């Protein structure tokens, strides 16, 4: 693989996807400290919201330590070169949330839908483009449909005004060939000025190989997270990925030592538990389950006595998707009843 001379934009997720691993409990001081460190390390894009995006604060998804407005108000004014992005999932976030983010200085909005539901993004993408925002169509759980079906959904988002389309491996299920076929098709069939991005999770240990495959096939925006802080086994660990890109002579603009120090000195000390591939996060990738389901399944194990990995495997069989967090408890309860009946 020869990537020498290619240029990529790295986008940090530790303060948004990392919210899942922290049960949305990141303090304002932690948020500002990490964002400032990322800014000084040269990270050009930093995502800041509730783990489930703007408006995510709810009983279903979890209540954060602070509101999106408070996080954005604290972070945006401190940035010297980095731009701040926000995630918005239609049905959770609204156009009013989008306007709030714009008013608070967000430069990039990423409108995220399940990979088959791009049509629900039209209002939000159109509104973002009218505001002059860098507007990304973010197709989640992209492993669940064929490359051709993904392209059709991407074309919808592009037609609404998205200037960048993401292939999103929300479950950490994909292997490099899965990424290559999808990214190659998107690159060849979307408008040449439309950027292509990839968002990976490390549940099968494939986040770096998958991200490299995406770059090889034409993606120029790659998501990652310092120290991998994110849902499941985390996102592509940015400090590791930066070192790999250095080795491959890819242009990325990040100071390796500084990003290593942010990971080691700021992010790792605030982790509630190590971000690693354990039996439960591995099951997420193996079964193709939405990565943010991990902590929900582990809580259900304590509540119902059913192993989390068995719950996750069943959720994979049921083809659950993001937004169906309520099914985790229902599934665990049903499995517990079946186990009890089998023992009777």
From Swiss-Prot:
Coiled-coil stretches: none
Domain of life: Bacteria
Pfam families cross-referenced by the UniProt entry: DmpG_comm, HMGL-like
Annotated site residues (Transition state stabilizer) in this chain: 16
Keywords: Aromatic hydrocarbons catabolism, Lyase, Manganese, Metal-binding
Residue ranges of every copy of the Pyruvate carboxyltransferase domain listed in the record: 8-260
GO MF: 2-isopropylmalate synthase activity; 4-hydroxy-2-oxovalerate aldolase activity; manganese ion binding
EC top class, as a word: lyase
GO terms under biological process: catabolic process; L-leucine biosynthetic process
Catalytic activity of the protein: (S)-4-hydroxy-2-oxopentanoate = acetaldehyde + pyruvate
The keyword Lyase belongs to this UniProt entry's keyword annotation: yes
Annotated EC: 4.1.3.39
Protein residues bound to Mn(2+): 17, 199, 201
CDD domains associated with the record: DRE_TIM_HOA
This protein's record includes keyword DNA-binding: no
Annotated InterPro entries: 2-IPM_HCS-like, 4OH_2_O-val_aldolase, Aldolase_TIM, DmpG_comm, DRE_TIM_HOA, PYR_CT
Ligand binding (substrate): 16-17, 170, 199, 290
Catalytic residues (positions): 20
Family to which the UniProt record says this protein belongs: Belongs to the 4-hydroxy-2-oxovalerate aldolase family.
Protein name per the record: 4-hydroxy-2-oxovalerate aldolase
